[in-house]
Amino acid sequence: MMNLAEYRHSNARLADFLPWAALVDEGIILNKDGSFQRTAKFRGPDLDSAVPAELVAVAGRLNNALRRLGSGWAVFVEAQRHSAGAYPPNTFPDVASALVDAERRAQFEEAGAHYESSYFLTFLYLPPEEGAAKAERLLYEGRDRTVGADAREVLRGFIDQTNRVLQLVEGFMPDCAWLDDQATLTYLHSTISTKRHRVRVPEIPMYIDALLADQPLTGGLEPMLGSANVRVLTIVGFPGATTPGVLDDLNRLAFSYRWSTRAIMLDKTDATKLLTKIRRQWFAKRKSIGAILKEVMTN
């Protein structure tokens, strides 16, 4: 990437804040921090006909697939609610089928605006730093110890790992497939723009951030994306236990929105270190009985 510090020292446009840099393989984005990401489009089981035991089983199998990812990995799950557009044209071999479709088309047009949901699963992997990569090479025989991490080797490992995870997900998802280059750019464009259209892959797939950012972002108390107002809703605290499909009512809302959930993975050892650090910080905040009595008497 070109060093823009010679021309501009501060971020001025939306593209400056986007992480995407280039397409390095089919549907795989290289980010500015050296991480790789790829996205799959999926559709889960029908919640109206599925029994609770089936949904619990699906949630358990999904957890078993994602728990294989450790430190350096992040998973993003997004649901997009968008306009369904016009009724699709169809041809039928007989008059009876055409009449049934005509009645269905009339009901579709009388109902007014229609919305549908699309679901995306994004995997992101940030390789270890150069020093950690060199230390890892010393632990295995037959590896070149004179150079650092090979970018092609890291990319092949990322592709292999994500393919294995998606194969597990395909076993219980009715529809699940990786996005190609054009579908990936189209999806990323839909996350930062209100204009819904396909994005053609450029001849040199570089500077994806500037290619996709076609609307200005205005911050402040009343944020806007282009001419559209943006409102952000976040959940401060999740309950201790939930049931699968608890947010299914969001699929019936008659307006456009994006629901995004992120999970940052940690190895067991890294998670233990983090919990120990947090526990020590809380333990350091303890107060003696004398300090409590002093606060009560002075206040």
Where in the sequence are the language-model features?
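Extended, folded cores of ATP/NTP-driven motor/assembly subunits in large transport
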Residues: 1-299
